[in-house]
Swiss-Prot record:
GO biological process, one term: DNA replication
Protein name: DNA ligase
CDD domains, per the entry: BRCT_DNA_ligase_like, LIGANc
InterPro entries per record: BRCT_dom, BRCT_dom_sf, DNA_ligase, DNAligase_adenylation, DNAligase_N, NA-bd_OB-fold, NAD_DNA_ligase_OB, RuvA_2-like
PROSITE patterns, A to Z: BRCT
HAMAP family attached to this UniProt entry: DNA_ligase_A
UniProt lineage: Bacteria, Pseudomonadati, Spirochaetota, Spirochaetia, Leptospirales
Binding annotation for Zn(2+): 403, 406, 421, 426
Any one Gene Ontology molecular-function term assigned to this protein's record: DNA ligase (NAD+) activity
Catalytic center residues: 122
Family: Belongs to the NAD-dependent DNA ligase family. LigA subfamily.
Chain residues that bind NAD(+): 45-49, 94-95, 120, 143, 177, 289, 313
EC number: 6.5.1.2
Originating gene: ligA
Amino acid sequence: MSKKKKTYQNTLSEKEAKKVIAKLADEIRHHQYLYYVKNQPEISDFDFDQLFKRLRDLEEEFPQFKDLNSPTLVVGSDLDKDFEKFQHKLPVLSLINTYNDDELLDWVNKTDPDGLYSVEWKIDGASIVLYYENGMLKNGVTRGSGGIGDDVTDNIRTVRNIPLRLPEPITVYLRGEVFMTFKDFEEFNELSSGKYANPRNLSAGSIKQKNSADTAKRPLRIFTYDATFPGFTKKFKTHQQILSKLEKLTFPVPPDTVFVNGSKIAETIKDFKKKKDTLGFPTDGLVIKLNDISKRDAQGYTSHSPRWARAYKFDAIMKESRIVDITYAVGRTGKITPRVEIEPVNLAGTTVTFATLHNQDYIDELGVGIGAIVRVAKRGEIIPAVEEVITPGKDVFKIPDYCPSCKTKTIKKENLVDLFCPNPDCPDRVKNGIIFYCQRKQMDIEGLGDKQIEFLYDHGYIRSIADLYDLKDQKEKLMEEEGFGEKSLAIIFNGIEHSKQKDFRFLLPSIGLPELGHKVTELLIEHGIDSIDEILSIAKDKKRISSLLEIPGIGPSTIKAFEENFSDKRILKLIARLKNAGLKLKADPIKVSDQQPFAGQSWCVTGSFENFQPRDKAMDLVVYYGGRKVSAVSSKTTHLLAGPGAGSKLEKANELGIVVYNEKQFLDLLKSLKINFKNTI
């Protein structure tokens, strides 16, 4: 690990950020290699998470330096040149880690506060995927890159509690964790002169033995924790049903798994913590998952992990310090987040001077005040969090009744504990909204980073995203400002001008309206609602607004936001200004080629891709060459393009026997058809 780290990414210049991002990416790849391939990690899981999260945050702030091969876009790899490679039938993703109750419960409240969740042990072993066909073990494969793994079937057959033949001729793909009990590890390690560091390293190394006879000598076991049943007539509705089926098929599953309401998770975690030191096997936390499969499908995936699950890690690094001051931050949605300034303390190799406090309920529970002696923990955040008050301070801190940025009275939103500023003209809200609009994954305006936007706002040059398109009129005045030379301004103005050519499918979500992100925008366009004029027309008709509920993926909260957004005079004025500035307020039509190799085919897409961002670019290509794009998998679908993060669409495609392509296979297909996709899209 690097010994010298800056505490906050916003202290970096662009030049420094570029170097730090490249260095972090290399450092993470190095540790992934040591962890997954060599089975000799040099740093703890926690320290690795800090590196990963710092890179992700820096890439978000400086998106111009994010590489398509960034570790944040792919899972770690345990691929080894000594084994045959195996293309996974489903993407094998990792989980987002959380390190405290507050962080976990915040996710629960955002996901489904009243839903049912499974809580199960997170086994600290070696990840494996088992493939059974007609009831027989066909392949045992490491996680690998998430798409391709090492085929270690011969070694896996020696694991003592893996069934080689199932009691019924069923096809099933399972996720599991190969491990050793503490007792078995100690006995084996004693015979090996104590040369192994821990059960996890020994387990991971054991399944990578070149001779399966050597693996057979090692006391390996497995717990299986999830499965997909392609072609199975019974459709599982819950995770609980899947685990029950696994037990009937004689698979070992983690003990103590419970299913509880979201409101009971904190209490359940306490119960698990009481047991963790009495277990006979290694665990480094818990896994919390939504139980309802349909709700999982609605949550979806990122390229790296499912949105419907979290890993809760027990271990955390904590240090004591004294609170010096308490300040606030106001985000683009108006959410007010307090943070404390503390006396400098070294935490996980970083000098820390600030910590978050999350929300007022959390503050009240801890009793936080200036002068308080507190315990601060780094539990997966770049800025650590206050976890405990040892000695109270002067007065318990209260989030102000008025916004610290604009002095508007704060409000609480339904089902949320946080306070919000309701003023759409709040300076901090506006600045953060413009920053969001300019980000790479939004309108991608080169030259306009956080610092430039804050300067332009603070000095009166801009007050909304529409003002960006009049900025050129102030060129002479801007050239007098420090840091805005002719070269810098040329980059900014070119970036602003270039953004006018961005498709409507980027513009609408970039405006930052609640419930109108990229996913909903794509759904609207798929169903013929492809322009702002059409949207405004629907917004005036209650029946047409209600009909949007017929679109899979659009719910009541989206409908409510739709009505509120497009009846707001401020938003209508903004749209008019963007229209006058020459931005595209209608989605680009899909052109059609004379060459029609996809004619008669119906394609669906799921997951994420390196070469097609957004993923609908791949489907635009299919349509351009004669095919049809569909939003859901059905018996009429002929092909599915599936990338990392694929969910129920891939499962259904396998059940229906639909042809499935991964990204490499799709690119090979295009090559065989002599289609240069880069020139086409």
